[in-house]
Regions:
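Short beta-strand segments
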Residues: 31, 45-47, 120-121, 127-131, ...
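PLP-dependent enzyme catalytic core of the Aspartate aminotransferase-like
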Residues: 23, 146, 161-201
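Helix N-cap motif at beta-to-alpha junctions
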Residues: 133-137, 176-178
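Conserved core segment of the aminotransferase class I/II
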Residues: 19-97
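Short, conserved catalytic or adaptor-binding loops enriched in Gly and charged residues
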Residues: 16-23, 109-111
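Residue-level detector of anion-binding/catalytic polar loops
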Residues: 150
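Conserved PLP phosphate-binding loop immediately N-terminal to the Schiff-base lysine helix
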Residues: 1-15
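Conserved glycine-rich beta-strand-loop-beta hairpin in the small C-terminal domain of fold type I
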Residues: 90-104, 116-131
Length: 201
């Protein structure tokens, strides 16, 4: 439901594939409304085979006396149903679309065709993945920090935050205003080019 545009691509139901190939016990699905309503206060969901669900039921039964039922009711009253969730997420998209467009504008206008990096152009979600030349992610983030732009730490998308090639930077454009993003992206693309030139010298 975290789509930026109307008529999003429909994702395959991974559980259907697990049923087809007899691997349902290998899959545990998790989700929450945390980025739909408010961070840390959403309702979480768990999907799995009956065997795995029973495993979770046993453990959850002794971990907590029960979920926050008042918060669950607030979520239900606010969102109501799938149509309510989708309507609410369209409002999210209206806020986020210009921010993602600003990121793409700077990446395309300043870095395209220069051989200094590649990047995603997501149709949903909350991040743009930027791959610099190998060995430069930490340096680009350091340079940006010195110029006053705080970026997600290098390796954030990897297990234990260890990017073996030190190249992936996760750009998170959802929080800043479009105006602040404009300034931050001007600095970011300069840092990418500066680090790339220094590496080649």
């Amino acid at each position: 439901v975290h789509d930026l545009f109307e008529n999003p691509q429909q994702l395959a139901n991974v559980m259907d594939f697990c049923r087809k190939y007899g691997t349902v016990d290998n899959l545990i699905l998790t989700a929450s409304t945390s980025k739909i309503t408010y961070a840390g206060g959403g309702i979480s969901f768990l999907g799995a085979s009956e065997k795995n669900l029973e495993h979770f039921r046993k453990r959850l039964a002794v971990m907590s006396i029960g979920p926050n039922k008042l918060n669950q009711q607030r979520q239900v009253l606010f969102l109501k149903n799938l149509a309510g969730v989708l309507a609410h997420m369209r409002k999210h998209a209206e806020i986020l679309r210009p921010k993602f467009a600003m990121v793409q504008k700077h990446l395309e206008s300043e870095l395209a065709g220069k051989g200094v990096g590649t990047w995603s152009n997501p149709k949903g979600g909350y991040f743009v993945s930027f791959d610099a030349l190998p060995g430069l992610a930490q340096e680009i983030i350091r340079l940006a920090g010195e110029a006053g732009v705080k970026l997600t730490p290098a390796g954030a998308t990897y297990p234990y935050s260890h990017d073996p090639n030190d190249k992936t930077i996760r750009l998170a454009p959802t929080f800043p205003s479009v105006e602040d993003l404009d300034q931050a992206m001007q600095i970011f693309v300069i840092c990418v080019q500066l680090a790339s030139i220094r590496q080649r010298l």
